[in-house]
Amino acid sequence: MDSKEMVVEEIMRIHRSLPLRPEIDDVETATSLIQNVEKEDRNRLEAIDKLVKTSSSEVPLELFNVFKEMKKSLVRFQSTEQTREATKILDLESVHVVFDELIQRASFCIASPNSTTALPRSVPVPAPVVSSDEIPFKSKEIISRDDTFVKKAKSSFYSDGLLAPSKPQVLDSTLHQAKNVAGNDGEKLSLIKLASLIEVSAKKATQELNLQHRLMDQLEWLPDSLGKLSSLVRLDLSENCIMVLPATIGGLISLTRLDLHSNRIGQLPESIGDLLNLVNLNLSGNQLSSLPSSFNRLIHLEELDLSSNSLSILPESIGSLVSLKKLDVETNNIEEIPHSISGCSSMEELRADYNRLKALPEAVGKLSTLEILTVRYNNIRQLPTTMSSMANLKELDVSFNELESVPESLCYAKTLVKLNIGNNFANLRSLPGLIGNLEKLEELDMSNNQIRFLPYSFKTLSNLRVLQTEQNPLEELPRDITEKGAQAVVQYMNDLVEARNTKSQRTKPKKSWVNSICFFCKSSTN
């Protein structure tokens, strides 16, 4: 390098060889993400340290310690993987900071009357970013190296081609893929890309974010920055591997729909109760064993799906959800529905199939707005006697239980259209005598029971179109009649009742003329 021009050209070539500089927002996102990961790691490591071998355990202490150390090592490895992209961004930014200062030093040398003058200061070699506590730059000092990405002043460059020591304004993002990744089909988001997307969405006041099946499998928790999405109205995080929700989720104050189904969430933060505008919440297919006490604050919630979890009880606070219309708790381990359920005065649909219910509380019968009640595959022996108050009930399914009888009060729920009492096997032996009151009944499944007779009122079920009677020891109903359909059975019962009435009238004892004469004789003697 014999000439100044050759040295300048080589300096600029080296400068141009760097990858594009991260945008300020991306650097701040990476910094925040690393801080979040470190915080989460501390919590996880503390939880591992608190693991204690029980005295009754047969596991040797040394083996137990090996187990704990392996869990810690896994946490550290996962931390490294999660912060890899963020660390790369900060390392790249660190190099750009150093190069910018070196360019300024070179410019100072060229601008100086005596180019051999000592340089104003030395610049240390940049070290890789390891911890969020040691960020080697300030975001306000970031300078772009490429004039196609900056707004230049008229004197941005010297005549020799070196960058002047002014600070151009960054206009474009160098991580545009992270910004638009939500729209790229097939690509899953890493932690840094998710964090970047959250930052951009927060600045744009995004109202809807769909990340269904879009997060990498290794991503088990969400960054605290999620709470910045205060304008978000709909959020879909379903079908991922999320295990923990950040406490900052309570900051989503505009949220009306939250879909978290098919994740691995074991516990909800208390801050979930701060989502006061929430209308629809889907938590199905997770690992929840309880609900937070703050749940009672979700007074605008209309649809709640808790199916396919590990719930053993529903809290009494469920009765505070006065706007709740649909509640799905199918496929849990629930043994009892709380009496406070009567407080859900807007309830239209209650699904509690595949649980361990032994009975339904009388309070269920007071849900006058309820239209659908399905409790299949439980251990229910009896239904509430208050069911006559269910003025809007249209569908009732109590199949595959241990039902011993159907209360007469149900026959006053005259809006009933579908009734399934099938597969109660040896326990159910009769139908209520007033079943004919159910004038709107269209479908009746009474199969696989021990019912021997149909009530005479059956003849008034004029709207019945589907009837399942298989595997019952019916004594008065020929099989060929049942094979003809529901209305054939109704007509048969009508004919049977009329025939019996006619027969009973014919067999009534009539007064003979001898009895009449004796009667008059007795009257005259008196």
From Swiss-Prot:
Q: In which tissues is it expressed?
A: Widely expressed but preferentially in roots.
Keywords tagged on the record: Leucine-rich repeat, Repeat
Q: Which cysteines are joined by disulfide bonds?
A: none
Matches recorded under Pfam families: LRR_14, LRR_8
Report which superkingdom the organism of origin falls in: Eukaryota
| Motif mapping: GVYW | 485-492
Q: Which SUPFAM superfamilies match?
A: L domain-like
- Keyword Repeat in the entry? The reply is yes
Q: Name one GO cellular component term.
A: plasma membrane
* Start-end of each LRR repeat: 229-252, 253-275, 276-297, 298-321, 323-344, 346-367, 368-390, 391-414, 416-437, 438-463, 465-484
User: What InterPro entries has UniProt attached to this entry?
Assistant: Leu-rich_rpt, Leu-rich_rpt_typical-subtyp, LRR_dom_sf, LRR_domain-containing, LRR_R13L4/SHOC2-like
Family named by the database record: Belongs to the SHOC2 family.
Function, as annotated, reads: Leucine-rich repeat protein that likely mediates protein interactions, possibly in the context of signal transduction.
Q: State what protein this is by name.
A: Plant intracellular Ras-group-related LRR protein 5
**Organism, as annotated:** Arabidopsis thaliana
Lineage here is: Eukaryota, Viridiplantae, Streptophyta, Embryophyta, Tracheophyta
